[in-house]
Swiss-Prot record:
Keywords: Ribonucleoprotein, Ribosomal protein, RNA-binding, rRNA-binding
GO cellular component: cytosolic large ribosomal subunit
GO biological process: translation
Recorded family membership: Belongs to the universal ribosomal protein uL14 family.
Identification of the protein by name: Large ribosomal subunit protein uL14
PANTHER family, alphabetized: 50S/60S RIBOSOMAL PROTEIN L14/L23 (PTHR11761), LARGE RIBOSOMAL SUBUNIT PROTEIN UL14M (PTHR11761:SF3)
Gene that this sequence comes from: rplN
InterPro entries linked to this entry: Ribosomal_uL14, Ribosomal_uL14_bac-type, Ribosomal_uL14_CS, Ribosomal_uL14_sf
GO MF annotations, alphabetized: large ribosomal subunit rRNA binding; structural constituent of ribosome
Length: 121
């Protein structure tokens, strides 16, 4: 579960390393976000000589969370880290590659992330 002030790693090659969640989208009383939800983030650390600068505000989609997710068949899945993928203003992925596994729940939200990911759990 991701909330305001949560830090996430960026798992694409956009140039950002770590981001801070500043807003969970989806209503005024919505506190938590999970896999497949869109959040507003600010970039905290970047790769040297990248086009993304520290402090940029952007939208991101969550691809991995530490909190376990219950699936339709009753099984649970959880990951080792909280990770997201940065989006541009039109909602497309900023990077061209995704590192690490992503959750199967993203198929209903964004198919391009699933096709770029090396492993879908």
């Amino acid at each position: 579960m991701i909330q305001q002030e949560s830090r996430l790693i960026v798992t694409d090659n956009s140039g950002a390393k770590e981001v801070l969640c500043i807003r969970v989208l989806g209503g005024t009383r919505r506190r938590y976000a999970s896999v497949g939800d869109i959040i507003v983030v600010t970039v905290k650390t970047v790769v040297p000589s990248s086009d993304i600068k520290k402090g940029i505000v952007s939208k991101a989609i969550i691809v991995r969370v530490k909190k376990e997710i219950r699936r339709e068949d009753g099984s649970y899945i959880r990951f080792d880290d909280n990770a997201c993928v940065l989006l541009n203003s039109t909602g497309e992925i900023r990077g061209s590659r995704i590192f690490g596994p992503v959750a199967r729940e993203l198929r209903t939200v964004n198919m391009k992330i699933v096709s770029l990911a090396p492993e879908v759990l």
